[in-house]
Amino acid sequence: MSAVTINDDGLVLRLYIQPKASRDSIVGLHGDEVKVAITAPPVDGQANSHLVKFLGKQFRVAKSQVVIEKGELGRHKQIKIINPQQIPPEIAALLN
């Protein structure tokens, strides 16, 4: 399975998360996943909520349209973005 998949109702992203980074960013490919650096620590779900907020801004969707499908407690996550309004250039490059 590739890092980014398009299906009927949106995008499915396979992510590798780097918590406690100096800034939020979509870094690029990390093996067969997209590496995302976020500033939040991996404590009490802070990293997950920060990730959902960050991805919501990147894809211009509400936080409720960013769904963590797999990997709630780990660095390797599968996230669904429902009906993205915009696709960040780092992700668009992986779709080609």
From Swiss-Prot:
Paired cysteines (S-S): none
SUPFAM superfamilies membership: YggU-like
Signal peptide coordinates: none
UniProt-listed InterPro entries: DUF167 (IPR003746), YggU-like_sf (IPR036591)
Domain of life from the UniProt record: Bacteria
GO CC field: cytoplasm
Transmembrane region(s): none
Family in the record: Belongs to the UPF0235 family.
Record protein name field: UPF0235 protein YggU
